[in-house]
Amino acid sequence: MSELATQKAGEGTVSRLLNVVESELQAGREKGDPTEKQLQIILEDAPLWQRFKEVTNEMIVTKNGRRMFPVLKISVTGLDPNAMYSLLLDFVRTDSHRWKYVNGEWVPAGKPEVSSHSCVYIHPDSPNFGAHWMKAPISFSKVKLTNKLNGGGQIMLNSLHKYEPQVHIVRVGGAHRMVMNCSFPETQFIAVTAYQNEEITALKIKYNPFAKAFLDAKERNHLKDVPEAISESQHVTYSHLGGWILSNPDGVCTAANSNYQYATPLPLPAPHTHHGCEHYAGLRGHRQAPYPSAYMHRNHSPSVNLIESSSNNLQVFSGPDSWTSLSSTPHASILSVPHSNGPINPGPSPYPCLWTISNGGGGPVASGSEVHASTSGTILLGNPAVTSPSSLLPTQATTSAGVEVLGEPSLTSIAVSTWTAVASHPLPGWGGPGGAGRHSSSSLDS
C-alpha cells in the first residue's frame, strides 16, 4: 500500500513539472511559425545603441575579458515552437583599416592587423526549443571581449579595429541548417583598451547599472573634498598667524565695536566661539616658521592676552607660550622704519603695521618711529593682512622697511616688504591724517 502511494506521489510530481514547462513554453508557441517563413529578429534597446553610435561606440578589451555595454539583446519570433535551435554570436570587421582617436574624433590610421581566429560565442541556453527562445528577449550579457587568445569562450578582438556583432540561428536535432543570421549597424563599435572619448565614458557611467557604484563613490569623494577645500582656503588666510606671529594661534579675534578699551588683560580662550571671534583649530604648524629653528623655541600656554593701556594703544602680551627671542645687548638692536606721513585713506583707521612680540610683552609700534631693544631680545614683525570675519574694510598702509636684529652669535637680516593692515573699526590714537603714531607705555626706548 505504501509503495502505491509513493508511486502516485512521484507521478504527481512529474505531472506538475511538465505543466510548469508547458506553461513556460506556451508564451513562445504563440509567437511561433512551424514553417519559419515569418522569422524575425528585433534589436532591444535600439535607441540606446543609436545614442552610442552617434559618438562612435567603444568597447573595452582586456586580457581577462570584459563584458559589453550596452548588452546585446534580441527578440525572436517565427521559429518552430517544437524544433530545437542554438543561437550563436560572432564579430566581423566593418572595414579594412585601423583607427585612431585624434583631436576628438576617430580617423583611419593605416592597414589593419592580420585577422585573428574567428571566435564564436554559443549562447548558454543552447540548444533549446523555439518556444523557449521566443518567450522572452535573449540576452548576450555573458559575452566577454579580450585581446588575448586564451579560450574559455571569450571573443578575441584586435584593439583599434571596428566590429559589428552578428547573430546566427541554427536549427539542430537532425540535419543542422542555418535558419537566419542578422546584424545591426547600431551595434558597431571600436575595440579599445581604454576609453578615448569622454562622451562615451559619460554615457557608460550614466546608463550602466553596474557603474552606479563608481558614480556614487565619485560623488562622495567630491562632497568630501568640498569641506577640505574650504578648510584649505581658511588655512591660506590664517595659517600664517598660527605658526608665525601669534604665540598661541588658537584664537583669532577682531573687535566687535569701536570702544575697544579694556582695563585688564583680555584672554582669548580656544575652546569656544563668540560674536566677532572665530576659532580656527589645527592651524599651528600648517606652514613652516620663517626663521631658522636654531633661534626659536616654543613653550606652551593656553591663551594670548590683549590689553589696551591708558594711552589707547593696543598691546599683545604673550604668556609662557611664546617665541624665545634672540639674545642681544641692551644697545645692540636698533630699528629704523621709514613711513610716509601722508594722509591715510578715509574710513576706519588701520591697526599699526608693526607688532613687537617677546617674552615680556611689547606694544604696537607706530609708523615713522624708532624702537630700541633693551630687553632680552625683541623680534619685530610686520602685521600681515588679517581679514575681519564681521566686516571686510581693507585699508592699505604700505611700509617698506628693513628690519635688523643683532643676535648672538650672528647677524640675522630680515627684509619685510609690503605690509597690509585691515581694520574693522577705528581705534583712537592710532595714526590719522597728519598725525604720527604713539609709543605704548610699555614700548622699549633706549
From Swiss-Prot:
One of its GO terms (cellular component) is nucleus. The keyword Metal-binding does not apply. The keyword Nucleus applies. InterPro entries: p53-like_TF_DNA-bd_sf, T-box_DNA-bd, T-box_sf, TF_Brachyury, TF_T-box, TF_T-box_CS. It is found in: Nucleus. Keywords: Activator, DNA-binding, Nucleus, Repressor, Transcription, Transcription regulation. Its main location: nucleus. GO terms for molecular function: cis-regulatory region sequence-specific DNA binding; DNA binding; DNA-binding transcription activator activity, RNA polymerase II-specific; DNA-binding transcription factor activity; RNA polymerase II cis-regulatory region sequence-specific DNA binding. GO terms for biological process: cell fate commitment; pituitary gland development; positive regulation of transcription by RNA polymerase II; regulation of cell differentiation; regulation of cell population proliferation; regulation of DNA-templated transcription. Residues 43-216 bind DNA. SUPFAM superfamilies: p53-like transcription factors. Transcriptional regulator involved in developmental processes. Can activate POMC gene expression and repress the alpha glycoprotein subunit and thyroid-stimulating hormone beta promoters. This is T-box transcription factor TBX19.
